[in-house]
Amino acid sequence: MTSKIFRYPASGVNRRRLLQGLAGGVAATGAMTLFGPAVRAAKPIKIGYVSPKSGPLAAFAEADDFVLGEFRKLVKDGIKIGAQSYQVEVVTKDSQSNPNRAAEVAKELITRDNVSIILVGATPETNNPVATQCELEQIPCISTVAPWQTNFIGRQANPGDPKSWKPFDYTFHYFWGLEDVIGVFTGMWQQVATNKSVGALFPNDADGNAWGDKVVGFPPVLAKEGYKLTDPGRFQNLTDDFSSQISAFRGADAEIVTGVIIPPDFTTFWNQSRQKGFKPKVVSVAKALLFPTSVLALGKSGNNISTEVWWTPSHPYKSSLSGVSAAELAKGYEQASGKQWTQPIGFVHSLFEVAVDAMKRAGDPTDGAALAKAIGATKLDTIVGPVVFGSDKVPPFAAKNIAKTPLVGGQWRLNGEKYDMVVTENKQAPQIPLGGDMQALS
């Protein structure tokens, strides 16, 4: 695999070891009260949170302020862990949709803000550099909203050599995998009569390289299912000309288009496709079409475009923190913001569910090793579904660090002046109700 990996050199002494050394020095001078129970009990737990508040991935963070605001209300009186009550602070950082910036702010959270844990959830470009920094510094990290392969395999020293893959000690990730989205997409395609010719849009980033990988990505599975895949090759994000891809798809008579690209790139591709007369019967693209604002940018031509669906108000789950249902959380956001619900709402909320649950079981939430161990033992029903690490639903080599959540597929249907998400494929997660059948693009 040629996944792009972001590595950052470890300094000679990481934060955890430095603090251990300082503690030893204080003990030698007889000033042990600095690290005594009275001070520790009064010290708040600091949770770091990284997301792309600005830049091309900003749609993933659109609901952050609402979700974080609700969480702060829930913990305003602190959380009880054992016999002690801890105040909770959430320190947020903007990755600016830039992997290098994501690593920088993770480092700031660890060394300047002294957080006990970092939460992150918005594509590999945000997750991977943050998780890499946390693993180096021995700070627990929980991530989500990226296929698990991009997180576990993409962060390995040699992603192309499965024999060299090793589990991580401090970083944990939950979401669905490429095997799930392939099943969802093909399940939707089977509902529409096509020639099974598929055009692929795979950019030169962690997602694109993973999805287009000839061993673990789309190509081998689609070939086995009888689909002919046309992959014109990798392209850079924020490309302004998709002429070569459109030409290749027309040459292959592609009636299906798939891929995993950022929202502005799909808008460019789709507008140019319409201008050039390329009109496939089915378009199922990940990442770009998750948000109603992205589909609205396409005008009426966005009707019946399909995508993966990881969370909706109709998901039959509730929060372990507040007890609110998925429907209630989505309604709360719409009432507070005046905007339509978006999928990340549920997953950002769930990050704090998993974090609080682990902190309560860790005993000492400031003990990184104990907290990491508690995260790895998580078996929690959340607002996005069960989060269970060590499950047999994940290949053994990744089970320590990865948990899977349910995935369905759906289409955007024009409803007056807005688009509604209609779930059209749920074979892999029948507990999530269907809203209708697949329809071909007009």
Q: Where do the model's predicted regions map?
A:
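Hydrophobic alpha-helical
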Residues: 124-135, 240-241, 247-250, 254-275, ...
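C-terminal segment of N-terminal export signals and the immediately downstream linker at the start
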Residues: 11-12, 33-52
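Beta-alpha junction/loop-to-helix N-cap segments that form part of ligand/metal-binding clefts
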Residues: 59-66, 78-158, 174, 235-242, ...
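Extracellular/periplasmic periplasmic-binding protein-like sensory domains
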Residues: 148, 273-349, 361-362, 424-430, ...
